[in-house]
Amino acid sequence: MKSKNKILAVTAFAMLSLMGCNIDPILTDSYSEDVAWSNVDNLRLNLNGFYSLIGGYYGSEVENDACTDILKMNGPRDSENLFVFGSAPITPAANPFNNWDNRHTWQLSCCRFLHNLAEHRGNFPESIANEAEAEARFFRALVNFDLAKRFGASFILHKELPVMGEKNHARCTPEECWDFIYEDLTFAAKYLPKRWDDATKDPWGEATHTGRVTQGAAWGMLARAMLYAQRWKDASDAALEVKKLGYALYKNPSRPDKGYGELFMNRRSSRVDNNESIIE
């Protein structure tokens, strides 16, 4: 009898074990690729991750101007002043302007997004897919432009997501660099909206779009990049497109003589309808 009970117990345990093997648990601490690319809301959350690049631009990138006569830092121990006066020398091992690793990481993130978007493009309306691609290509051009400014437009340029384990990827030529930046930004200018509609419910949802890159941002970035490339006609044409979009110096209709000064008195948290602002 005891032997029979043992056999039944072992059999029951084995059956439960086999049944347990068929259970596919739902992970609650991460999302699969299919979930991340399943709908428009998740697509937008994916894109939001790139916007820290704009916040970073208005931090260290602007502060770099303090190494010239464009901007002044007040503190004698501000790093920019230490560099200028030689108290903190720049060396190959310690270079605060070095963005090689950071920008190449972002470059690959943009390529990975575009690769996955191409694989899941059928999940979205074509207009939304084009807008998403345009946003990602804007940011890819932005990080490549950052690399071009630092490394003479000769760096490791990935036009597509590289194969895992790929080594010895040759640096691009300056012509390849500027052509690729031009292609990305002209695509972005074509498919980004002139202005995001904050009240839209379809297809992006009800959340505000203030601060998202626009057609003007793409043309403006292209004009600046082409100046660095010394492609004067391309720079002039892009700047003209910005002008056509109606950007203008800020003025307060009720106090036209105080408009410019008021910009420096507004809180960052308060929204100002400012036609002078191209990239926020």
Regions found by a protein language model. Give the residues of each.
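Bacterial N-terminal signal peptides that target proteins for export
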Residues: 2-9
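Bacterial N-terminal signal peptides
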Residues: 10-17
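Short, surface-exposed recognition loops and adjoining beta-strand edges that mediate ligand/DNA contacts
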Residues: 60-75, 157, 194-221, 228-280
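Membrane-proximal, proline-rich intrinsically disordered regions
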Residues: 21-66
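Bacterial Sec-type N-terminal signal peptides, specifically the leucine/valine-rich hydrophobic h-region
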Residues: 18-20, 144
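Conserved, well-structured interaction surfaces
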Residues: 39-56, 78-151, 166-179, 185-195
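Short linear capping/connector segments at secondary-structure termini
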Residues: 29-33, 88-89, 158-166, 200-207
